Design a protein with these regions (language model features):
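GNAT-family acyltransferases
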Residues: 1-101, 117-118, 122, 131-133, ...
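Conserved acetyl-CoA-binding loop-helix of GNAT-fold acetyltransferases
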Residues: 96-98, 104-121, 137-145
């Protein structure tokens, strides 16, 4: 995947090994990963997980994009993803993660909106899913702002989660 995107304020570049250390550093902030299962300790398992997600080919239209502000194009702010659910599918899911200094500024919503647009208009998908920990108010707000509809409460890897979806009809209705 070599798709680059822009929004009014952001640059979205395919995430590469150039972004590896910035991703690890972001994950080491316990506030960033407090609602996420996994070993976020900088150890071998953590590093291998991040490396595998960076190096994996998710297909022509899917992947992870590193987020940068146009005003500071070398300052890593986080990532947004559009990949097969849990990396295996068949459903396609959106995700996002930001460094703490980027929280509360509309960055995740702006980046996610652009990737949603790509998913429906560029990749031609019919449905996208997303989930977030039930207490992660920031991610839940992003999902709603972007246009995801709440579907159900459940669990993800043993953690209380809220599950969302957006269909092509939902996307089209928001564009009118």
């Amino acid at each position: 995947m070599n798709l680059h995107f822009e929004t009014p304020n952001l640059l979205l570049r395919p995430r590469t090994l150039e972004h590896f250390e910035a991703c690890i550093a972001m994950d080491l902030d316990p506030q960033v990963t407090r609602y996420l299962p996994g070993p976020w300790d900088g150890g071998e398992e953590h590093r291998n997980f991040v490396r595998s997600r960076i190096e994996r080919d998710f297909g022509e239209s899917c992947g992870y994009w590193a987020i940068f502000a146009k005003s500071a194009p070398e300052e890593f702010l986080g990532w947004v993803s559009f990949i097969p659910y849990e990396a295996v599918g068949p459903e396609l899911e959106m995700g996002w993660r930001l460094v703490r200094r980027a929280w509360g500024k509309g960055i995740a919503s702006e980046a996610a909106r652009r990737i949603v647009e790509h998913a429906f208009l560029g990749a031609g998908v019919e449905r996208i899913v997303a989930d977030a920990h039930a207490l992660n108010a920031g991610s839940l707000a992003v999902a709603r702002k972007v246009g995801f509809r709440f579907v159900r409460d459940g669990e993800f890897e043993g953690l209380p989660s809220k599950f969302f979806e957006m269909t092509r009809a939902d996307f089209d209705a928001r564009r009118r």
